[in-house]
Design a protein with these regions (language model features):
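Hydrophobic, well-structured modules enriched for small/aliphatic residues and gly/pro motifs
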Residues: 3, 9, 47-49, 90
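Catalytic tyrosine of NAD(P)H-dependent dehydrogenase/reductases that use a Tyr as the general acid/base
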Residues: 53
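Active-site helix of classical SDR
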Residues: 56
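Strand-loop microenvironment adjacent to phosphate/nucleotide-handling motifs in alpha/beta enzyme folds
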Residues: 32, 62, 66-218
Length: 218
């Protein structure tokens, strides 16, 4: 996916082609080749998106979810896992701060800014759980902490000064893993949530709910 938020704001056509057209091509290819199960990786920015990247990932998520009804007799199952910031991944804030630490000055967009953080291992575990649990149409969301960017910066370079540079195009102060509109068909489990789609009444399907507790009933 095209995943850098400001880059997507300045290059919308490439972002749409990669994240939306690419998802459509992948759904078609998996169905054509008879793939049994597909788990797509998504992002917290797809929840109530305000930037182009988040909007394209929201569309991508919906394409994969709808692929379950589109697959027909092939019975290809599609599900989605929603990540926060994967610590250490390419383009994320921690590797950037590490590269800047020797300069003794870290650029901070806004002192109030927070981000959800998860480890690579947590991300991999969530994917494997999705493969084991999925019926088709689920969005799996890991329970992960939200951290202040200033706390992350201090953990990496305690002595470094912070230079306030302002929020970049398309960025939010605070992300959310699950939007208010999704809460009515979101179920809670020990270490994750599962958002079930409203289409085809799948949010009421006992096989998909699988002993989950409804987050919001009204």
């Amino acid at each position: 996916a095209t995943k850098i938020v400001p880059t997507a704001e300045y290059n919308p056509f490439e972002c749409v082609k990669t994240n939306i057209s690419g998802a459509m091509n992948l759904v078609d290819a998996c169905i054509d080749q008879g793939v049994k199960s597909v788990v797509a990786l998504s992002t917290d920015k797809a929840s109530s998106p305000v930037n182009l990247y988040g909007a394209t990932k929201l569309v991508s998520d919906k394409l994969f979810i709808a692929g379950n009804s589109y697959s027909g007799a092939q019975d290809t199952q599609f599900a989605v896992v929603r990540y926060g910031n994967v610590m250490g991944s390419r383009g994320s804030v921690i590797p950037f701060f590490v590269t800047q630490a020797d300069k003794n000055v870290l650029p901070i967009t806004d002192t109030r800014m927070t981000r959800f953080m998860m480890t690579v291992e947590e991300g991999v575990d969530l994917v494997w759980h999705a493969f084991e649990d999925m019926v088709g149409g689920e969005i799996y969301v890991k329970k992960i902490p939200s951290m202040k960017i200033t706390d992350v910066a201090r953990a990496i370079a305690p002595a470094a000064k912070h230079e306030i540079v302002g929020i970049l195009p398309g960025e939010k102060l605070h992300e959310q893993m699950i939007g208010l509109e999704d809460a009515a068909h979101t179920y809670e489990y020990e270490d994750h949530y599962k958002i079930l789609p409203a289409i085809f009444n799948w949010s009421q399907d006992p096989a998909r709910i699988n002993k989950g507790k409804l987050v919001q009933s009204d």
